[in-house]
Amino acid sequence: KQDRLDGYFTTHLTSEMSQYGKLSSPIYLENWYWFTHPDSVNKDPKKLRYGVVHGSYQANWFKTQNITSLLEVNSLEEIVNVLHHHRVDKVLLDLDDFNNAADHLGIDASAYPRSFYRYVPLGVFAANKLINSHPSFLEKFDETIPQCAPAPFYLSQGEQVQILNTLLEPIKALISQPIITDAAAQSNHIKLTNKALKLADDHWIKEVKTHQHDLAKNMLFTDASLYLKQWQRQFKGIITEIIVTDKQGKNVAISKITSDYWQGDENKFSLVYQQSLAYRFDSVEYDASTHHFQVQLSLPIKNAKGDHIGVINLGVDVEKALHSFNNNALN
């Protein structure tokens, strides 16, 4: 506020901060969950006692919510212990932090009902004066993040189970439909050389970058692609995109325009096609333009004989999915 700093690291963006600068792309993701004492599950929400670690990101968030029934402690293990002894009813913590602290204290973490709240991206906050004097700073900084950021962020086992419980069977039904298997099989009759694949991919990418989209639009209105879009609507934004490929990784059907034509050089294809996995989740990715977190879910497409003939990749809006599943569980 006093214009004395160019920025600071690491932080999350609050509504108060937004007028003073911008946040970089995430360097790290925190996975915030509500943890409730078992005896407080049915307690009147207006009477809940909350706990928080002093000076934490969660403490800053609580201030913005005007929650006054708040016990502040000095450490992560202390807040978990306070919940364990029922001095508070509910805490908001990163999932891994809670599990690790509970394990260190010899507390059974699974005994505490939990519900997903949100992902919190942590990055470098650049003040307006830094951005004004160095307009390209954030763009260049964001480009270097993959080289120095921690390991990719993956869904927890419990989160994967939640998503699969809702999506796996409908996806299996989708990829068994003749309109999908026939499209993949027909494309497999046209095998391209590596050189031809590269040329086709480059052509597609060039068109997308120049907003031509001729190749992509032609594919977007095939029967198989239209079927994907119709199927996708039932999930009300949880599924953000669908790509069906043949056994070479070439696009066969798409629910929206994709950035490239050939998926064969990407993990979402190569680690699923002709492999033993029934499905695969990729790492969670952050879309800075939409502020959404997405994960790719991939499954092999098989013919009636059980042979692999392609792969389906689905983009899943993780926050929307987990919130939806939590709400359904409560109803």
Q: Which residues are covered by each model-predicted region?
A:
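Extracytoplasmic/periplasmic sensor domains and loops in membrane signaling proteins
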Residues: 213-229, 257-286, 330
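Extended ligand-binding regions for polar small-molecule ligands
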Residues: 46-47, 52-57, 121-161
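Extracytoplasmic/periplasmic sensory segments of membrane signal-transduction proteins
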Residues: 150-153, 157-258
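Acidic, polar ligand-binding/catalytic clefts
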Residues: 1-47, 54-56, 99, 110-119
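Short helices/loops that flank or line small-molecule/ion binding pockets
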Residues: 1-6, 77-97
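Bilobed "Venus flytrap"/periplasmic-binding protein-like clamshell domains
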Residues: 37-67, 71-73, 79-81, 96
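Periplasmic-binding protein-like
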Residues: 28-33, 104-142
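Conserved beta-strands of PAS-like sensory domains
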Residues: 292-328
